[in-house]
Amino acid sequence: MCMQEYSTCPTIDHDGLHKICCYSHSQHDCRDPVIDMPPCCYPTLVRKQKMTVNPGSKSHHPKAGLLSYLPAALVPYGELLRVHRALGYYLNTSPYVVGIAYSAATAPTKLPLDLLLDRLLLLTLWSFILRSAGCAWNDLIDVDIDRQISRTQSRPLARGAISLPTATIFTACLFALGCSLFLFLPRQCAFEAGIEVFFALLYPFGKRFTDHPQLILVNIAWAIPMAMHSLGVEPGRQILSSICLCVFIATVIVLIDLVYSRQDTEEDLKVGVKSMAVRYRDCIDTLAYSLFAISTLALLFGGLLGGLRAPFVVFSVGGHIVGFWTFLRASLQTGPAGVESRAKSSCLMASIFWLLGLGIEYAVRV
């Protein structure tokens, strides 16, 4: 039988991809685990891949970056939370910051600065914890897929640096810690947080059943009504402007994730992972620029319908156009390599101008 004729052990070839060394009696050759392995052996291969990792990769201590400052025992947990991937924290935190700044600029009466800072602190903490818990949950669900993608094979669960039971308990504690913050916020915020948690739990399953898992990420737009409710501002008072700002956040999130996920398209096709980058790989430029146009119009109308004027249009909308146009031109013309660094710099520039325009609008209020 197949299990008797073949035994497998993982090796690493020159391009960093896992190969499987197959021993068939006296013959020995290295084969691609997906393409070259006899079909009857594949279930055995998958089971053994789950149990075997490169022993040298279980524990390592980075010599540079944020992870290098952590004790060796905590490095896998830092990797699990993606503390060294600032872009993800930006994507989760900036909607709350924008929501608070927008509320301050459009509220019926000028909100006190100490209240704004208090809510900014609480919602920033929430966004950091939600992002961290979401990453850990995503790795728990995707551990088998991560072992088949070269970019994700070194993640702590995929390489066996953290056990699945330990990661499960750790993830549950993170979600519980995040939910405890809503003891200090209005009840409506807890309801909106529950919606965000639901979609965070749903997200890793999306790539298995739909070509549009990025659309699940639009739930991050709930940060806008949550920020408004935290300050006692009712989104329904200016429902159209609130909806426009939610559309703005949603399209920006989907746009960045769409461009970022291009780097895995070839391997996603082999493994069978679904995404918008895979589905629209032949027209991804058109889709990306369309999302960019929608986000720009949504931001513009969200401000105008909320009573904002020249400072918002010049700085917030203008900065968004310059920042994301630069990002798309660089990323779509030069390919997926280095997309994260380009996204961080361009998005940071855009965010500064978003807040500058909204901050000026708040400052000039009587």
UniProtKB/Swiss-Prot annotation:
It is a multi-pass membrane protein. Its cofactor is Mg(2+). Its EC number is 2.5.1.-. InterPro entries: Prenyltransferase, UbiA_prenyltransferase, UbiA_sf. Gene3D superfamilies: UbiA prenyltransferase. GO terms for biological process: terpenoid biosynthetic process; ubiquinone biosynthetic process. Disruption phenotype: Impairs the biosynthesis of calidodehydroaustin and accumulates the intermediate compound 3,5-dimethylorsellinic acid. Its main location: membrane. It is found in: Membrane. Pfam families: UbiA. GO terms for cellular component: mitochondrial inner membrane. The chain crosses the membrane at residues 97-117, 121-141, 164-184, 215-235, 239-259, 287-307, 308-328, 346-366. Keywords: Magnesium, Membrane, Transferase, Transmembrane, Transmembrane helix. GO terms for molecular function: 4-hydroxybenzoate polyprenyltransferase activity. PANTHER family: POLYPRENYL TRANSFERASE AUSN, PRENYLTRANSFERASES. Belongs to the UbiA prenyltransferase family. In A.calidoustus, the austinoid gene cluster lies on a contiguous DNA region, while clusters from E.nidulans and P.brasilianum are split in their respective genomes. Genetic rearrangements provoked variability among the clusters and E.nidulans produces the least number of austionoid derivatives with the end products austinol and dehydroaustinol, while P.brasilianum can produce until acetoxydehydroaustin, and A.calidoustus produces the highest number of identified derivatives. Polyprenyl transferase; part of the gene cluster that mediates the biosynthesis of calidodehydroaustin, a fungal meroterpenoid. The first step of the pathway is the synthesis of 3,5-dimethylorsellinic acid by the polyketide synthase ausA. 3,5-dimethylorsellinic acid is then prenylated by the polyprenyl transferase ausN. Further epoxidation by the FAD-dependent monooxygenase ausM and cyclization by the probable terpene cyclase ausL lead to the formation of protoaustinoid A. This is Polyprenyl transferase ausN. It comes from Aspergillus calidoustus. The gene is ausN.
